[in-house]
Amino acid sequence: LPIKGMIGLSLGEYVALIASNALSFEEGIKLVADRAHFMQQDADREISTLAAVLDPQLQEIQELITAQQENNQRVYIANYNSPQQIVVGGTLTDLKATLKKIEEDNLAKRTILLKVNGAFHTPFFNGARQQMHNRLQTVDFHEPQIEVISNTTNSLFHCEDLPGILEKQLAVPTHFGANVKELVKHAKIDTTLEIGPGKTLSRFAHQVDQQLNTQHIENLADYEKFIKEQKD
């Protein structure tokens, strides 16, 4: 298939980089295992969590969170997934206070506390970020053979940028929605193929651009069906 570009959300970014030959499969597996270990250490050190915010009034929520931070509340936007969903993280107390304010001010259709043990992609994971900085210096990276757009910068990965961006990714927001827009604009795509369990990313992609033909492969049967359809 003529693949024009790839995106992976959070951990999935490593899958995209492996598929693009920016790093080997063996090195990639070791690297994500170490990444998980570093993140678990931060998660154990201080309790934090995430909440999804559906149909957000983004500018108003950004202003609210800035005000909360100025009031010494530890709450941050963690993921900009699509025009219809962002994810906010923080300590449980501060996060609940922020969600309550969002609901009182009608700044979103709905908020949902997520069952996770960390406010990923926020400063709560600065410790893991520092450990990844050191670990990434040992990795033999290569120029991606297929273009991969970074969650962090919304620009194409290049070999020399990989260590710095992957380190930073742990503690700053992801921008999947903007990544999809960039892929449509830069690579002129009209079809996306999500590989993995569930169809969450396909849903985000469709929310970004309703003209996209979103396809999904979850298992071998899906793969064989997809390949047959392409041949036909």
Where are these regions (language model features)?
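Helix-rich "cap/lid" substructures immediately adjacent to catalytic or cofactor-binding pockets
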Residues: 1-7, 88
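Alpha/beta catalytic cores of group-transfer enzymes, especially the acyltransferase/condensing modules
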Residues: 20-171
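Acyltransferase/transacylase module recognition
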Residues: 1, 140-232
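Conserved alpha/beta-hydrolase "nucleophile elbow" surrounding the catalytic nucleophile
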Residues: 8-9, 80
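Glycine-rich nucleophile elbow surrounding the catalytic serine of serine-hydrolase chemistry
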Residues: 9-18, 22-23
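Glycine-rich beta-strand-to-loop/alpha-helix junction loops that act as flexible
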Residues: 11, 91, 195-197
